[in-house]
From Swiss-Prot:
Record SUPFAM superfamilies: Nucleic acid-binding proteins (SSF50249), P-loop containing nucleoside triphosphate hydrolases (SSF52540)
UniProt function note: Acts as a component of the Mcm2-7 complex (Mcm complex) (Mcm complex) which is the putative replicative helicase essential for 'once per cell cycle' DNA replication initiation and elongation in eukaryotic cells. Core component of CDC45-MCM-GINS (CMG) helicase, the molecular machine that unwinds template DNA during replication, and around which the replisome is built.
GO terms for cellular component: CMG complex; MCM complex; nucleus
EC class name: hydrolase
Protein name, per record: DNA replication licensing factor Mcm3
Family according to the record: Belongs to the MCM family.
Motif extent (Arginine finger): 472-475
Superkingdom, natural source: Eukaryota
Gene Ontology molecular function terms on file: ATP binding; ATP hydrolysis activity; helicase activity; single-stranded DNA binding
Biological processes, Gene Ontology terms: DNA strand elongation involved in DNA replication; double-strand break repair via break-induced replication; mitotic DNA replication initiation; premeiotic DNA replication
Gene name of the record: Mcm3
Alphabetical keyword list: ATP-binding, Cell cycle, Chromosome, DNA replication, DNA-binding, Helicase, Hydrolase, Nucleotide-binding, Nucleus, Phosphoprotein
Keyword DNA-binding: yes
Length: 819
């Protein structure tokens, strides 16, 4: 029987040699073998579809009797390789064959992998949950006997080998005569061995049931081909191993999959960039509005949030990481926090980043612990040793971590990511393990305010409720509000309804939709000829899907092209220009020195030295979007605009009850007067006190303005509004207030050149007077002495206002103090 089995293997080996030697036909696999030899690889990937066309009987036998067929195919490959390159065949003891293509009903999931597939070749898809350490497995040991001076060798096989009879695993220590043997480790042959565990994809698991898993055995060149969290497609032979309990073999068996090919289904592995793609990206980068086009193409199904999309684009592009000669690391990763009301598409923006970024790890605040985000110390089941398991942020090294429900995390777990967000590494010192792991990732987090919804009558710090040490590590913090506006609501509702009405053009009438469609399904049966098709640059316009939110001439980049553009743009390393450096330094010093001069504006996060690095990173990301080698002043201004939008938030005052009309009776006036006198002065608006002339009780008549529907709750300009013009903003002013409002107008704008001349003349007046303070009237008359172009009253008022804002002078009771 053994002779017949060996003869059968030799017969089918000749058929496989004929399949590989196809130079007279198309020469596909003859060329693949030559490429394998040139790359010094040990594994040839064969498409099952090609084998079905040329030799259907062997293809059927390969799927049903995997062990013998793979053994014969491997020998045939070595035989054919020895004819092409004899030296290469002698160098490698074994050559391996991997398979891909369509496996029909043998394309299964871990749940459907039952005993009927034992001995068959199957294709399994799943998510890698656990990866063991790589350990050497002995293939052939060489032993030397000092007494007889003879050398003997022994081969080892186990149940994971394709040989029929497994050998013992013990090393020989004595020969037949009882002489001691010495193992020659340098002459012995070992192979790498690793085990994986893949779990059923959650979208393919039946409703209400937990996903199942299967163990995978990888040898030689298949080790370290994937990491935990990867979606993989593994082809291999399904085999059972006997289970032992107490030294006896039980009736139940343990099943494993002996892998021969591992394909990654993640976005990063399938990113094939050609020379044409690079030229197309460079051509597109020459457009003046490339940054707006890229940001508009981010999550086009979400209406609005233009600044948030620009920030997410900067996060995907990133800054330039610097390692100084003394070892100091300046991070280039950009961190963004989205906080705001429910139903403003925060989680949907995170979901889009997961589909766009080359490497992105999703997690939630409540479902993640501190060690789950960084690293955990576990016990190896095989050896019992303590080992490290990487967390989400370590797995997302050089990628993005998306944390939803960030406010639901406990303070202890939230503190664990402080080191990662700034230093880009995780330091572990526990259970006798001292290690430092790289976690150079960007963090995109979404959270709800402390009160569930954003309270506009409280400061941003009170609404956010996070520590300053954590907030300063976020480069940008956006407050996203659900503002009631009939026009905007109408546009959003029209946009959402059109998306729900949309149907795929390829969908037939009455065709049932698949329940478990996923990104991996679309790649399961893709042939190699279809993978290299050109990527569409723009999305096709659909009147039903896009509707009023997008005109026909407006263009949106496709998701596939966005991935390629971001990947190419991240290779650029722009350098800061002198003008950009000066603009960034001036803006940072202004942010540090400026207090909240407006009574209704507060900062969303503290201004620290990290803010300066934020401006640099955002400027660099904007330059990368243009694929520029240098950071210009336009890039710096774009970064400043983003920071201005994200750092300041308007705070509204509580509505005060207005006084009743005077003809309603004196009793009502007295009651109102008592109520106003009992009100704390701290609750009184500064704007109200400034707008009133005297200390008359009519100051209570003035109500703060209601929030405008079109107001984006952001400070639109860098210069704050002067206190004198506040009365113009009051709603429904009385006749007395109208007189105040008409008499006080906004100061005239003064140019920078005239402002510098005014500063020089003012310094001269203070030097001549040898005083630290001068009356404003004296300055007004003396400032124009000897001047060829006298300053107007409006220019003087504007200059004093500008210098007061810059903390250069202080005005009190019409006296100017020099700071």
């Amino acid at each position: 029987m053994a002779h017949e089995g060996e003869q059968f293997i030799k017969d089918i080996q000749r058929e496989y040699v004929d399949f590989l030697d196809d130079e007279e036909d198309q020469g596909i696999y003859a060329g693949h073998v030559k490429d394998m030899i040139a790359e010094k690889s040990k594994r040839l990937i064969v498409n099952v579809n090609d084998l079905k066309r040329k030799n259907p009987q062997r293809a059927l036998g390969l799927l049903s009797n995997a062990a013998d067929e793979q053994l014969a195919f491997g020998r045939a490959l070595k035989e054919y390789a020895s004819t092409v390159d004899p030296g290469y065949a002698k160098m490698h003891e074994d050559l391996f064959v991997g398979f891909e293509g369509c496996f029909g009903n043998r394309h299964v999931t871990p749940r459907s992998l039952t005993s009927i597939y034992l001995g068959n070749m199957v294709c399994v898809e799943g998510i890698v949950t656990k990866v063991s350490l790589i350990r050497p497995k002995v293939v052939r040991s060489v032993h030397y006997c000092p007494n007889t001076r003879k050398v003997m060798e022994r081969k080892y096989t186990d149940l994971t080998s394709f040989e029929a009879v497994p050998s013992g695993a013990a090393y020989p220590t004595k020969d037949e005569d009882g002489n001691l043997l010495e193992t020659e480790y340098g002459l012995s042959v070992y192979k790498d061995h690793q085990t994986l565990t893949i779990q059923e994809m959650p979208e393919k698991a039946p409703a209400g049931q937990l996903p199942r898993s299967v163990d995978i055995v990888c040898d030689d060149d298949l080790v370290d081909r994937c990491k935990p969290g990867d979606r993989v497609q593994i082809v291999g032979s399904y085999r059972c191993l006997p289970g032992k309990r107490g030294g006896y073999t039980s009736g139940t068996f343990r099943t494993v999959l002996l892998a021969n090919n591992i394909s990654l289904l993640s976005k990063e592995s399938n990113l094939d960039i050609s020379r044409e793609d690079i030229m197309l990206c460079k051509k597109l980068a020459k457009n003046n509005d490339i940054f707006e086009l890229l940001s508009k193409s981010l999550a086009p199904s979400i209406h609005g949030h233009a600044y948030v999309k620009q920030a997410i684009l900067c996060l995907l592009l990133g800054g330039v990481e610097k390692i100084l000669p003394n070892g100091t690391r300046l991070r280039g990763d950009i961190n963004v926090l989205l906080i705001g009301d429910p139903s403003v598409a925060k989680s949907q923006l995170l979901r889009y980043v997961l589909n766009t970024a080359p490497r992105a790890i999703p997690t939630t605040g409540r479902g993640s612990s501190g060690v789950g985000l960084t690293a955990a110390v576990t016990t190896d089941q095989e050896t019992g040793e303590r080992r490290l398991e990487a967390g989400a942020m370590v797995l997302a090294d050089r990628g993005v971590v998306c944390i939803d429900e960030f406010d639901k995390m406990s303070d202890i777990d939230r503190t664990a990511i402080h080191e990662v967000m700034e230093q880009g590494r995780v330091t572990i010192s526990k259970a006798g393990i001292h290690a430092s792991l790289n976690a150079r990732c960007s963090v995109l987090a979404a959270a709800n305010p402390v009160y569930g919804r954003y309270d506009q009558y409280k400061t941003p710090m009170e609404n956010i409720g996070l520590q300053d040490s954590l907030l300063s590590r976020f480069d940008l913090l956006f407050v996203m509000l659900d503002v009631i506006d009939s026009d905007v609501d109408q546009m959003i509702s029209d946009h959402v309804v059109r998306m729900h009405r949309y149907r795929n053009p390829k969908e037939a009438d009455g065709e049932p939709l698949s329940m478990g469609s996923s990104y991996a399904d679309s790649l399961s049966f893709v042939s190699s000829s279809e993978e290299k098709k050109d990527t569409e640059v723009y999305e096709k316009y659909d009147a039903l899907l896009h509707g009023k939110s997008r005109q026909r001439h407006e263009k949106i980049l496709s998701v596939e092209f966005m991935r390629k553009y971001i990947h190419i743009a991240k290779c650029m390393k722009p350098k800061l220009g002198e003008q950009a450096c000066e603009a960034i330094a001036n803006e940072y010093s202004r942010l540090r020195s400026q207090e909240a001069v407006e009574t209704d504006v507060a900062r969303t996060q503290p201004i620290t030295a990290r803010t300066l690095e934020t401006l640099i990173r955002l400027s660099t990301a904007h330059a990368r979007a243009r694929m520029s080698k240098s950071v210009t002043i336009d890039d710096a201004h774009a970064a400043i605009e983003l920071v201005q939008f994200a750092y300041f938030k308007k705070v509204l005052d509580k509505d005060r009850p207005s006084k009743r009309r005077r003809n309603s009776g004196s009793d009502a006036e007295d009651d109102n007067g008592e109520a106003s006198s009992q009100r704390s002065p701290s609750r009184r608006s500064k704007r109200t006190r400034t707008a009133t002339v005297g200390a008359d009780s009519d100051e209570e008549d003035i109500e703060p303005p209601q929030p405008d529907a079109g107001d984006l709750t952001r400070r639109e300009t860098r210069r704050s509004l002067p206190a004198r013009s506040v009365a113009m903003l009051m709603a429904s002013p009385s006749s007395e207030e109208q007189s105040v409002a008409t008499s006080t107008t906004e100061p005239a704008i003064i140019s920078d050149a005239r402002l510098g001349e005014f500063k020089n003349n003012l310094q001269r007046l203070f030097r001549e007077a040898r005083e630290q303070s001068l009356a404003l009237a004296r300055i007004t008359t003396a400032i124009n002495v000897g001047s060829q172009e006298p300053f107007t009253a409006g220019e003087i008022e504007a200059a004093v206002h500008r210098m007061t804002e810059d903390n250069q002078i202080m005005v009190a009771d019409d006296i100017v103090f020099l700071i």
